[in-house]
């Protein structure tokens, strides 16, 4: 059987230091990295996605200075920003495909 692993939005803006940070995000990044070190060879495909917003438009009204956290959010994962990059503790060397 062929296996694939999908890693979703493991980015700086979703971990402790980020615009939409959550407690434990860095720990998740470190654990995923450790898992990949031990198990990457078990997968034919390893895909990592990144939330990715264009800095030169309104992103469909997605961003707001007064977000309601339902339909609008503070600016996050803006292309080219630190927040849009993978978390500092995520070692992405085993990732075969990167999606934005």
How would you describe each model-predicted region?
Residues 18-25, 75:
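Short glycine-enriched, charge-decorated loop/helix-capping segments at active-site entrances
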């Amino acid at each position: 059987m062929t296996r694939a692993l999908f890693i979703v939005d493991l980015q700086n803006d979703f971990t402790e230091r980020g615009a939409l940070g959550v407690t434990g995000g860095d720990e998740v990044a470190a654990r995923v990295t450790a898992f990949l070190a031990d198990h990457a060879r078990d997968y034919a495909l390893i895909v990592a996605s990144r939330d990715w917003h264009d800095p030169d438009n309104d992103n469909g009204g997605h961003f707001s200075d007064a977000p309601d956290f339902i339909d609008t959010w503070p600016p996050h994962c803006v292309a080219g920003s630190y927040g849009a990059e993978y978390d500092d503790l995520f070692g992405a060397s085993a990732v075969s495909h990167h999606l934005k």
